[in-house]
Amino acid sequence: MKRTFILMMDSFGIGAAADADKFGDVGANTLGHIAKACAAGDIEGRSALNLPNLNKLGLGHAGELASGYFPAGLKKDIEVVGAYGFAQELSSGKDTPSGHWEIAGVPVLFEWGYFKDHHNSFPQELLDAIVEKAGLSGYLGNCHASGTQVLDDLGEEHMSTGKPILYTSADSVFQIACHEETYGLEKLYELCHIVRELLEPYNIGRVIARPFVGSGKGNFKRTGNRHDYSVLPPAPTVLDYMKEAGGQVVSIGKIADIYANKGITKQVKGTGLTELWDRTLEEVKAAGDNTIVFTNFVDFDSSYGHRRDVKGYADALEYFDSRLPELFEILQDGDVVVLTADHGCDPTWGGTDHTREYIPVLFFGKPVKAGSVGRRETFADIGQSIAAYHGLPKLEYGTSFL
């Protein structure tokens, strides 16, 4: 029985990519800088980063290969039981869909559309069309913003006026924040559908529904009912090939949204690291032959990376690491586990955006030969390796190392 489990540690980069200069990210290193800050005692309430399970899978060695130095605080003299390496991104952006699609064998070689102006970010003709088609009385925002700060700035006005908060970032996104109770969740989703259709000429990767609750400034909180409305991947992914072959592809968290539901046979919701881990272990136990279980652990990115919260990121990594033995205990002989990321989001870096970084490539399980797989020239090597293992059609991009 062959099964593959992909654990996507969203934003967990391990060193500035070779083309980081094109993105203003030379020197970024999500893993390296978190480890350095913890080991140096720079973070109140933190000691050295302790990731024994990830480290024995080769994380520290992968980090050294990618950046030239071993992550501070991790033990180097250990037996590595998995295959480890790092991968450069072919895709033109450092965004979520590009990273995920390339990992599944389909790099994004075109340029996404972006709303680059920090104020009055959206074209007036687009805003007018949204107001007319959705029957809005107006809108708030129309700017680049942090998802939490924009709630403090505009949440109360949104509640009193009923006008949705529209904002964007350096990514190819159009985000809409509305209060779940005063505006309504389904109404927010309907608005996102309308905006998704109107954005077609602009080549924007995602519309993101950002529902929140709370009574006023300082206590607004985003909920787990986020929904991403992505464009379709431009070619079949390894997930599509698995589904077409009669296998199962289980999405946990926001995976289905990122692939616009293509290649997915089952969707499982989960919010927060604890619930995502719980759901993952449940689906691993239930998985049959020729199954891919794919979980996105979004909190690394959304809760800690973008918010530049080094302590929170470090604590989350240690929690993630602490759950790995539960997975080890239930693996079967034909199982392959993949741990990777889709981009970086260095919490020590300036700004609030993603960072262009190498990603870790960690494979383990009885079918996997332990040792270095070195530098991979595309994230698609991951998808190609999964396709080869399951006897699926060869992908256009990527080289298998299994």
Swiss-Prot record:
It is an enzyme of class 5 (isomerase). Its cofactor is Mn(2+). It comes from the Bacteria. Mn(2+) 1 binds at residues 10, 342-343. Isomerase that catalyzes the conversion of deoxy-ribose 1-phosphate (dRib-1-P) and ribose 1-phosphate (Rib-1-P) to deoxy-ribose 5-phosphate (dRib-5-P) and ribose 5-phosphate (Rib-5-P), respectively. The lineage of its organism: Bacteria, Pseudomonadati, Pseudomonadota, Gammaproteobacteria, Aeromonadales. Pathway: Carbohydrate degradation; 2-deoxy-D-ribose 1-phosphate degradation; D-glyceraldehyde 3-phosphate and acetaldehyde from 2-deoxy-alpha-D-ribose 1-phosphate: step 1/2. Binds 2 manganese ions. Mn(2+) 2 binds at residues 301, 306, 354. This is Phosphopentomutase. It is found in: Cytoplasm. It comes from Aeromonas salmonicida (strain A449). Pfam families: Metalloenzyme. One of its GO terms (biological process) is 5-phosphoribose 1-diphosphate biosynthetic process. The keyword Isomerase applies. Its EC number is 5.4.2.7. GO terms for molecular function: magnesium ion binding; manganese ion binding; phosphopentomutase activity. It catalyses: 2-deoxy-alpha-D-ribose 1-phosphate = 2-deoxy-D-ribose 5-phosphate; alpha-D-ribose 1-phosphate = D-ribose 5-phosphate. Its main location: cytoplasm. GO terms for cellular component: cytosol. Belongs to the phosphopentomutase family.
